[in-house]
Amino acid sequence: IVGGNGCGKSTLAKVMSGVLPIDKGKVSVLGHTPTSPVMARNMGIATVFQEVMVAEEASVVDNLFVGSDDFWWKNFTQREKVLKAQEIMEDLVGEYVDPYTQAFNLSLPIKAWITIARAFLRENTKVLILDESSAALDFDSTERLFKKMRELRDNGVAVFIVTHRIA
């Protein structure tokens, strides 16, 4: 989804993910209209917005699993969560990230990866919406993100990329 500033790209992403209500027309994702983020999540829609969303005082592992009570890893032990955090962050970032490091000690690109990683942790994802999610990433990181998106696509996940530029 490509367009200039203010043309409605992010609004569409928010409607598709149940964050904003529809005021005109109809939006159908997987045959349904998501009316809340919870409904969208239950439908298998994972959304990553441009804003980097981390709790600065929390660790990498706590940031990754925040709000995860109803997901498949709810029965993971803390040790299993730490191992999963190490695995996903190393896979996405391309280097080791200490899962116990507090977010305020991390660079903006690593914080962006935490935000993105939450969507990749979801087991039931059928649709991934990335709304300017690579804005805080450098070229190599963006390449890694696109590689991961291709892997998801190859596994049957629909990927929507919202951007104002094609690079």
Positions of predicted regions on the chain:
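Glycine-rich phosphate-binding loops of nucleotide-dependent enzymes
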Residues: I1-A167
